[in-house]
């Protein structure tokens, strides 16, 4: 059985005192181990420290200024009143021992076998100690010889000891003869077939090469055959030579690329490379040129549009003035009387609604056609009379007419009926209600319609935006004339869509009624964060259908903060 073994090793450490803690005389010193033994996996760990304690007198006369950077300073020094001090310092210990060298942890313990110190300087203390560990197993003892499972007899062992030299001599010729036999039997086994196949392959490759090459290669065929014979005679060099030549011939048999094809490929690559930068440059030029072109086009369009509008407006005004001046006062009076009679006849009818739908459109169209014919006749008859009038008389007559219209507006509160010219519709479209709303209201309220004129920027003080007015009875025939004038207006006005003509004809049928629509004005509302369609309808006292129709909304649309809505307001505008 193994006995306890003792492991011993030396420890030497130096510590340094700081300035003001120099040692003049060392009174006592001791070194005690503080060790614990624990098992960690397959090892036994000895962890702890060697605690150094002592007392000494402080050297107050000597104050060195040397700085020791490579030394370890004393951890704790406590000074006393009598000029002495106590020092305490710990040297860490960490030792690991294999587990198979420890029988029991309780048997392992550490102690200080020998201890000495040396004070080389008043600030440097050197400690020398021999540390011993007991309780370990001794591996240096002689191991017991292993007993073999089978032991040969003594006579046989003696023969083995005596025969090995003779046996070794006999084996050498046997080994050489075996090697010779292998060498003799190996060549005739496979090489003949290999040589034949290689030679046949070589001949086939050479024939193919001869067919593809010019006639000069035919002269080389006998030489190739002689080479084949020489290769068959030399067995050892035949295989590598045939392999090398076969590889070289296969490389030669591969068609070489024509120089023309290589040049074509290079030209195509160069074109591709040059095409990409050219396309990029063209894109950049287009992007650079496009802003200038768009600005020029916008500038030209902005300059042309006011000129065209001014020309069209001037043509329509001149045509109106000519038509108004060519009509005689007596003829105007007659036309007014006829219009009054027609209105009286229409008012006496039993059912105004049915007459509106059935009879009034036909009568209105007939009256309009009669008015247009009468205007043309009067123009022909009165043209000779009024051709001698000056421009001053024309302007005077026109101004007198407009003044009479303004006077009639102040006297009678009944609503007036006026037609919109294309230029007026374009100018007032921003301030007026949407066209969709006007068309729907005209279809729903088929009995009456009110056309209100919003003030332009030039005359904000003359008319109020929501004032209803009516011209005297004598102005109705003039309205008929102005309604009929667009039918014989210049070519710029006759090019309007067919839908506008149908709206104008429907408007003329409604023109002769004495009732007005209840539509008055509208407001603009900015939607807040918590507003909904129902809340806005309750706030402005309108129905949700009116709000949805006015703003072209859907039934399931949700309002967003900052959205602008048009709020219609209705009031009774009957005279």
Curated annotation (Swiss-Prot):
Ranges annotated as biased composition (Acidic residues): 229-238, 249-264, 438-448
Ranges in coiled-coil conformation: none
Entry keyword set: Sporulation
Superkingdom of origin organism: Bacteria
Gene Ontology molecular-function annotations: ATPase binding; lytic endotransglycosylase activity
Disordered: annotated segments: 159-502
Ranges of compositional bias, category Polar residues: 465-474
Pfam families (alphabetical): LysM, SPOCS_spoVID-N
Domain LysM span(s) in chain numbering: 523-567
Any one GO biological process: sporulation resulting in formation of a cellular spore
Compositionally biased region (Basic and acidic residues): 200-212, 266-275, 283-302, 310-325, 449-464, 493-502
Biological role: Required for assembly of a normal spore coat. May be a component of the innermost layer of the spore coat that aids in its adherence to the prespore.
Protein name: Stage VI sporulation protein D
Source organism of the structure: Bacillus subtilis (strain 168)
